[in-house]
C-alpha cells in the first residue's frame, strides 16, 4: 500500500505532467515536420541519402512509426499517461480542495483569526449593533454570509475554485476525443474529374452521401504557376434526398454530415484529340514520375487509316504545351489545347481539350465534437480560475466589545487587503 501511494503521488505530480506535455509537444513537432501517411517506399527513397535530423534514415523512421506519429503506439501511450495523470491529480488534489472550499469553516476563537494572512481587532461602541451591519454590507456586495450567534463567516468568488477541476476535465475530454478520432477516424483522398461523383458508404454498406464535382478551376499567376485550386461540389444526402452546392479551395474546407472535405491537390485526368477527320477520342492521362513531379502523359497507339507510329504525349498543365515524342525519343511536335493542328508525318493532330481533375481529401473524425467540448470546458475553467476566492471571519466578544476580523484570498492578496479596509470602515459606520 505504501508503494502504491508513492506511485500515485508520482503519477499525479506536476513534474511528470510537465515532462509529458513536453514529450507530446515534441511528438507533434515531428508530425508537423515529417509528411504523414505516405507509402513506405516514399520514406525509404527520400530519407536514405538525406537523413532526417542527420541520423534517421527511412528504415528507422518507419520503425519509430514517424510516418504516422499521431496514431503511433508511443504517442497514444503518452496521451493515455497524461490522461491518467490528470485524473489522479483531479481525484487526489483538485476534488478534495473543491470540497474543502465548499464546506463552511467555523472559527470559534479569536486567536484562530489572528493567525490568518490578514487580520485586525478593534473595539466597537456599546450602542453598535455588532456584526449585523457588517452582514448586511457583505450581502449587498455579493458575499455569501453565515451567522452563528456572535460569529460570522463569509465567502465570495467560490466559483473560482471550480476552475482548476474544470480545466482538468476539459483536457481529459480533449485527449479522449483526439484519441478516439485517431482510432476511429477515416481518411480518403480521391481525384475527381468534372461531372464525376463519389459515393460515401456507411459501415453497413449503405450510400449515405454522394459528392459530385461540377467544376474545377486552377488560378495561375502570370508565369503559369498555380496559386489556388477551386472545386464546385454537389453534395447529396441520400437519407433526405436533398442536395447542396458549395465551393471548396485550399485553406477553405467544407464540413458536411460529419465529414470534412479539403481541397488537397490537382491532376490531369484526360486529353481529347482528333487525328485528321477521325472522331474525337479521349485518352486517360497517367502521371510519369520519371519525367518530373508534375508531368502527365500517354503513349498513343498506332491508329488505323493513319501512317502514325506510336507516340509519347506529355504535358504539365491543362493549358499545355502538349509535347509529342517519337519511339526513338526525338521531339515530333508541340501543340496546345484549341490551338492549330500539329502535322506529324502526313497526319494532322488536333488537341481538343485537356481535362484537369481535383484532388479532394475527405476526413471523418468522430472525435471532433468531443475535442470541441473539451476545449470549451477548459476555456470556461480557465476563465473561472482567474476569479479569486475570498473568505472572511468575524468574532465579536460581547463583554469586551472587541471585534476580530480576518480573511484569506487564494490570489491578489494586496487587492483583498484594500477591500478589507472598506469592510472595517463599514463596521464603524
Curated annotation (Swiss-Prot):
Location(s), subcellular: Cellular thylakoid membrane
Keyword Chaperone: no
Residue intervals passing through the bilayer: 14-34, 72-92, 162-182
Keywords: Cytochrome c-type biogenesis, Membrane, Thylakoid, Transmembrane, Transmembrane helix
Pfam annotation, one family: ResB
GO BP, one annotated term: cytochrome complex assembly
Chief localisation class: membrane
Any one cellular-component term (Gene Ontology): plasma membrane-derived thylakoid membrane
Membrane-related topology note: Multi-pass membrane protein
Record keyword ATP-binding present: no
InterPro entries: Cyt_c_bgen_Ccs1/CcsB/ResB (IPR023494), ResB-like_domain (IPR007816)
Assembly, per entry: May interact with CcsA.
Family to which the UniProt record says this protein belongs: Belongs to the Ccs1/CcsB family.
The protein's role, per its UniProt record: Required during biogenesis of c-type cytochromes (cytochrome c6 and cytochrome f) at the step of heme attachment.
Name this protein carries in UniProt: Cytochrome c biogenesis protein CcsB
